[in-house]
Amino acid sequence: MPRSQRNDNFIDKTFTIVADILLRVIPTTQREKEAFTYYRDGMSAQSEGEYAEALQNYYKAMRLEIDPYDRSYILYNIGLIHTSNGEHAKALEYYSQALERNPSLPQAFNNMAVICHYRGEQAIQQGDPETSEAWFDQAAEYWKQAIALAPSNYIEAQNWLKITGRLKEWV
């Protein structure tokens, strides 16, 4: 039974019902419907912390989905799972792939910045200030891109850029 048919969450059920109606009304191919079903089931599994199941659904959706914009969101969600699992190198790879297909994803730039900032903090703890600065510089570049796409978002990142003197390089 597809995950969407066994969902107990009210919001997910509502989303599923609306999505099913839209799939019937909007002209789409069977392949597109199947890809969306896998994507929807992946989101449902991901929201419940069932990451292995979510990844399986996302990979199936990727095999079927041909639209670059839609693929970007699948790749982004795969990146989220790898981030949650602490697999930062993989997460960065998937966020990059998402941005190749859709360069207007500020949340992907933000998540990449957060990972780089985290790695910078780790380098400080390991006594490696040079590596730390490189990671922080990379985080700054990603945050600048996120802020350029969504200027009213990422206030903490904007403050960090100001405090660390990285904002004036950009303005």
UniProtKB/Swiss-Prot annotation:
Keywords: Chloroplast, Membrane, Photosynthesis, Plastid, Repeat, Thylakoid, TPR repeat
Single Gene Ontology BP annotation: photosynthesis
Top-level taxonomic group: Eukaryota
Organism: Angiopteris evecta
SMART domains with a match to the protein in the record: TPR
One GO location term (cellular component): chloroplast thylakoid membrane
TPR repeats: 35-68, 72-105, 120-153
Bridged cysteine pairs (disulfide): none
Role summary: Essential for the assembly of the photosystem I (PSI) complex. May act as a chaperone-like factor to guide the assembly of the PSI subunits.
The protein's name: Photosystem I assembly protein Ycf3
UniProt cross-references to PANTHER family, sorted A to Z: CELLULOSE SYNTHASE OPERON PROTEIN C, TPR REPEAT-CONTAINING PROTEIN MJ0263
Membrane topology: Peripheral membrane protein
Recorded family membership: Belongs to the Ycf3 family.
